[in-house]
Amino acid sequence: MTVEIANESGVDVDELRLLDLARYVLDRMRIHPLAELSILLVDEGEMAVLHERWMDEPGPTDVLSFPMDELRPGRLDVEIDPDAEPAVLGDVVLCPAVAKQQARHAGHSTQDELELLTVHGILHLLGYDHAEEDAEREMFALQSELLTAWRADRRIAGRPGRKR
């Protein structure tokens, strides 16, 4: 999987953790190994511009997802086609400044919030949504499950702890 990250936000972020998390989620969701994903971290001004342009909403938001090729999660009982063409999953745009505010309210670190938003953004790229109550329950449960499993796997593997 090709996952690229660009931090244009001016905020110090543990980009390697976000890359590791994104790859983990794509693997767990059985997305073809040649799929491409881009993660962009921007400041509040840029996020406000994107939010208004694409969602017709004022002010910055925490995460925006821009799907490209229509990829969906694979099934565990079906092998991944090794001859399939690579596809671009899309872009996830994160705003660390907004994440910092949300993290303060949630009682955890900005990095924890950015990790949650990374999973959230990827799930949107895969077609998950939270416009309806049932869909929200499904998406948020999957989001929590993926994040919890990734953190547990990192602890078992002895990878470094969270950056605060």
UniProtKB/Swiss-Prot annotation:
GO terms for cellular component: cytoplasm. Binds 1 zinc ion. Pfam families: YbeY. The keyword Nuclease applies. It is found in: Cytoplasm. Zn(2+) binds at residues 120, 124, 130. Its EC number is 3.1.-.-. GO terms for molecular function: metalloendopeptidase activity; RNA endonuclease activity; zinc ion binding. GO terms for biological process: rRNA processing. PROSITE patterns: UPF0054 (PS01306). Its cofactor is Zn(2+). Keywords: Cytoplasm, Endonuclease, Hydrolase, Metal-binding, Nuclease, Ribosome biogenesis, rRNA processing, Zinc. InterPro entries: MetalPrtase_cat_dom_sf_prd, YbeY, YbeY_CS. It comes from the Bacteria. NCBIfam families: rRNA maturation RNase YbeY. Single strand-specific metallo-endoribonuclease involved in late-stage 70S ribosome quality control and in maturation of the 3' terminus of the 16S rRNA. Belongs to the endoribonuclease YbeY family. This is Endoribonuclease YbeY. The lineage of its organism: Bacteria, Bacillati, Actinomycetota, Actinomycetes, Acidothermales.
